[in-house]
């Protein structure tokens, strides 16, 4: 998951593009904003209807609630998935860092190994859910639009 922040001339966040990739190599973006493009306050909840298949253990239904925060260079994104009540709550956090060309090179070399680790952890969690008997949803066709609001 990646987030792209759009700011106005006063450097206030007015929209956020939430880019979601699934394990099938597909991508969908949720364009998060207030109806009038008013500045988004840290901690404010933004909502998007779920229209993209991410997990075979969650139907393509319901909604996402997003909240973002930042303090002293630490950033956090909280994502809640609701369908007939809350089903999943997760967060992603990170910090700002300056990066030199050499660091960028080494990061690029480490990235494939990190991707393999993420895929292995995803499949391990899926196996545990399958063993528990959690309902399985077949993969539908991806949405026709690449970005939804």
Task: Name what the model sees in each region.
Residues 1-149:
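Mature, function-bearing regions of proteins
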């Amino acid at each position: 998951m990646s987030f792209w922040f759009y700011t106005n001339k006063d450097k206030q966040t007015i929209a956020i593009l939430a880019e979601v990739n699934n394990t099938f190599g597909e991508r969908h973006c949720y364009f998060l904003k207030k109806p009038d493009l008013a500045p988004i306050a840290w901690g404010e909840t933004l909502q998007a209807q779920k229209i993209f298949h991410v997990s075979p253990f969650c139907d393509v239904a319901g909604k996402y609630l997003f909240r973002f925060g930042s303090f002293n260079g630490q950033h956090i994104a909280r994502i809640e998935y609701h369908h007939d009540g809350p089903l999943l709550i997760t967060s992603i956090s990170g910090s700002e860092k300056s990066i030199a060309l050499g660091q960028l090179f080494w990061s690029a070399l480490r990235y494939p190994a990190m991707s393999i680790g993420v895929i292995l952890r995803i499949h391990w969690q899926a196996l545990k859910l399958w063993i528990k008997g959690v309902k399985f949803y077949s993969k539908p066709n991806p949405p026709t639009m690449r970005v939804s609001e």
